Amino acid sequence: MRLETQALVPYPVRFDRSHHDALVVLGATATGKTALAVALAQKYQGEIISADSRQVYRGLDVGTGKDLALYGSVPYHLIDVCDPYEEYNVFRFQQAVYGIVPSILRAHKVPIIVGGTGLYLDAVLRQYALVPVERNQALRASLRGASLSHMRAVYFSLKDSHAVHNKTDLEDPARLMRAIEIAVFHATHPELLQQARETRPMMRAKVYGIQYPRSMLRARIRARLEQRIRGGLIEEVAALHKGGVSWQRLEYFGLEYRFTAQYLQGIIATRDEYVDLLFRAISRFAKRQETWFRRMQRLGVKIHWLVHTENGFVLR
């Protein structure tokens, strides 16, 4: 299922440095984004910046599909930058990109941002105004023991429901608490948000997206999942837990880690059930990714779609 990195011919990609200073490659899971990004980096003297919220973590290799051998001699950034117990978020990602992109440009190379974490990509392409927010112990104490529905009501009293960046925060109490904390800070410190807006660097990025027909994408997801299981996904999750990463923390790292952790604990009874449940969950996740990218388009991000057809990839 791997795309050959030297085969740029099937992709109608064009990049002119006089009009753009960066490239972005996005798409749903299992669409071959990394392979295309590596080929572009080889062609245009680029350096890759990973926009994957899980590849930042050391030790999460098989389940996140790091496949570092694919990069060859191409320099890459934001892979293996923190330990599993650390918090990594969209603010840290945005700040890192704002530092990395200028350094790549100063070296007369092309920054190539690649990934499928829509929130991270959107934060850079639409330049979210983000500021660091400390933990608010008094607020946390006031909401200790509150129900999820009450916490959601508090959150929506502070933030327009249509402006919610990451709706998965609404399903997890810890993440929802953090979202409330940030919303309260933003409401009480508007001057810092304004300052963040005024100091955002400009980046002229040309954005390409890879898209497959639904049936073909599901086949690619299935093949890649089986490849990862053969490649040691279950053993990786077991080793992470043995090394001190809790089952609860492992579930935070996404579907591969969540379902594998449940299988190892006996919550999922059989291997066949585990594989089937995980495949279905990843397929649903791919649909949510595509929905996010369509939302980005509606909000002004121009995406040049490379759509797979029976005659190869066409630009739409």
Curated annotation (Swiss-Prot):
Quaternary structure and interacting proteins, as annotated: Monomer.
Function: Catalyzes the transfer of a dimethylallyl group onto the adenine at position 37 in tRNAs that read codons beginning with uridine, leading to the formation of N6-(dimethylallyl)adenosine (i(6)A).
Substrates-to-products reaction catalysed: adenosine(37) in tRNA + dimethylallyl diphosphate = N(6)-dimethylallyladenosine(37) in tRNA + diphosphate
Any Pfam family: IPPT
Entry binding sites for substrate: T29, A30, T31, G32, K33, T34
UniProt cofactor(s): Mg(2+)
Protein EC: 2.5.1.75
Family as reported in the entry's similarity comment: Belongs to the IPP transferase family.
HAMAP family, per database record: IPP_trans
One of the GO biological process terms: tRNA modification
UniProt site positions, description: Interaction with substrate tRNA: T117
Transmembrane parts of this sequence: none
Keyword terms of this UniProt record: ATP-binding, Magnesium, Nucleotide-binding, Transferase, tRNA processing
Annotated region (Interaction with substrate tRNA), positions in chain: 52-55
Residue positions binding ATP: G27, A28, T29, A30, T31, G32, K33, T34
Keyword Cell cycle: no
An annotated Gene Ontology molecular function: ATP binding
Enzymatic class: transferase
Protein name according to UniProt: tRNA dimethylallyltransferase
Species name: Treponema pallidum (strain Nichols)
